């Protein structure tokens, strides 16, 4: 099966965060690590649900974005988007497991549908269960911190203000070394 190879080599985005070869795997592992932390520190969290959702939350990106060197949106990506594609994949995977609990399937699908947190950020649903909120927070934190890392790496030795950044709605600079 080509899926594991594609997953390892795929980017997590065309641009913005983790838009490099292997970015999808790096992002997925970072999000999963954060979710593991949440599950350890908040006993109400259903650990298996959250970790499964973390591992598969961006699976739809394999169909949404073409492989390198193109790394551009596919027709499925333009028409459907990775959230819908990922939710559909999760439903199909659960259907292959005999007696998979329907409520658990819906909760997994909900986590994928809600992982961007807000409808204006592309989520068709906002988080309604603790695991969906934890996944959203981990996904958002990793995406933003990686984006800042990329911005500051591009700035090189520039320790001054870098100018207004639309994504962060702020003028940015690196932390001083003092």
Task: Annotate the PLM regions.
Residues 12, 16, 75, 164, ...:
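Glycine-rich, flexible loop/turn motifs
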């Amino acid at each position: 099966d080509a899926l594991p190879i594609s997953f390892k080599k795929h980017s997590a985005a065309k641009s913005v965060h983790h838009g490099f070869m292997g970015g999808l795997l790096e992002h997925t592992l970072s999000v999963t690590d954060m979710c593991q932390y949440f599950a350890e520190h908040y006993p109400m969290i259903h650990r298996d649900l959250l970790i499964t959702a973390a591992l598969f939350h961006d699976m739809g990106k394999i169909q949404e974005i073409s492989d390198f060197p193109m790394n551009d949106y596919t027709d499925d990506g333009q028409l459907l988007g990775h959230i819908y594609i990922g939710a559909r994949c999760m439903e199909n995977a659960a259907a292959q497991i005999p007696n998979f609990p329907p409520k658990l399937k819906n909760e997994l699908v909900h986590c994928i549908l809600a992982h961007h947190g807000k409808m204006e950020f592309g989520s068709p649903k906002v988080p309604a269960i603790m695991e969906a909120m934890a996944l959203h927070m981990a996904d958002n934190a990793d995406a933003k911190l990686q984006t800042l890392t990329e911005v500051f790496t591009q700035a090189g030795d520039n320790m001054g203000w870098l100018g207004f950044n639309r994504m962060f709605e702020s003028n940015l600079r690196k932390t001083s070394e003092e």
